Amino acid sequence: MSQEFAHLSVLLNETVDGLNIQSDGIYIDGTFGRGGHSRHVLSHLGENGRLIAIDRDPQAIEAAKQFADDPRFQIVHGGFGQLAEYVEELGLTGKINGVLLDLGVSSPQLDDAERGFSFLRDGPLDMRMDNSQGQTAAQWIARAEIEDMAWVFKTYGEEKNSRHIARCIAADREKTPFLRTKDLADLIARITKNKERNKHPATRVFQAIRIYINSELEQIDQALEGALAVLAPQGRLSVISFHSLEDRMVKRFIRRHSQGESVPHGLPIMEAELNKSRKLKAVSKALKPSDAELELNPRARSSVLRVAERLDY
């Protein structure tokens, strides 16, 4: 792999340590990427351990060939939202000792201009995690209604100027279609008056389009529920988030399943009965990268790790 597209796994030790790995356990890396976390998990497994990796990016599947000779490893081409289905097909539901999810876009995807994720590198306006299927960002922008674009920018990017940006995109696309990342990024930079310090004006819009094109939040919701369904008692869930939308989802998911079912006030219920509805417990407070890691990998600055443990049924 070229140095340009090298990838540093974020919170590597903390994430894998959070899994509390058993040498003969069965683990899932739901976001294989370029294999950094998988490699670290495998280094903790004995010869009877097993790691099932998942990724929908064809380039990640190609990168997984580095582990082709390791009988403990297998790769599945697909989205992590379907992890429960893959585990069920393998007959391993309820037997998984740990699930790892590293959400968001990877450095190689950002750095490869041809993938169309970055507003800093000119390339085709694509943004698909799996570039073999689905509509591209350019195709969506070409036909989306102004209201729909504004909703996506505000909902998935928390962009305050969502409506203004959507109107400007709609007006400009009548003259020239948006086919390149630079075209879209330059337009947003040109029409944005109050620019945030140390943040490109197109950051939020590009994030929003990427999330929408790849149904990322739906995939995360399905992956979290799927992880809960496949984990064995005392199995661990380690999740790295990179922006507030992702982290809120993970935080609320863990909190909801840690508190158990809500009971109407005054209704007599035994503590043991209430405990049965509690499916998770938070293992630690949210973890952020150390100063040393941030110096080595500035892209880790917004990452947050949350770890939870599956309670007995």
Curated annotation (Swiss-Prot):
Positions binding S-adenosyl-L-methionine in this chain are G35, G36, H37, D55, F80, D102, Q109
- Reactions performed catalytically: cytidine(1402) in 16S rRNA + S-adenosyl-L-methionine = N(4)-methylcytidine(1402) in 16S rRNA + S-adenosyl-L-homocysteine + H(+)
Q: Write down the Pfam families for this protein, in alphabetical order.
A: Methyltransf_5
Compartments in which it is found = Cytoplasm
Q: What class of enzyme is it?
A: transferase
The entry's keywords: Cytoplasm, Methyltransferase, rRNA processing, S-adenosyl-L-methionine, Transferase
Recorded GO molecular functions are:
rRNA (cytosine-N4-)-methyltransferase activity
Listed GO biological process terms: rRNA base methylation
Superkingdom, natural source: Bacteria
Its Gene Ontology cellular component terms are: cytoplasm
| EC number of this enzyme | 2.1.1.199
Q: What does this protein do?
A: Specifically methylates the N4 position of cytidine in position 1402 (C1402) of 16S rRNA.
The UniProt similarity line reads: Belongs to the methyltransferase superfamily. RsmH family.
Q: What is this protein called?
A: Ribosomal RNA small subunit methyltransferase H
The organism of origin for this protein: Shewanella frigidimarina (strain NCIMB 400)
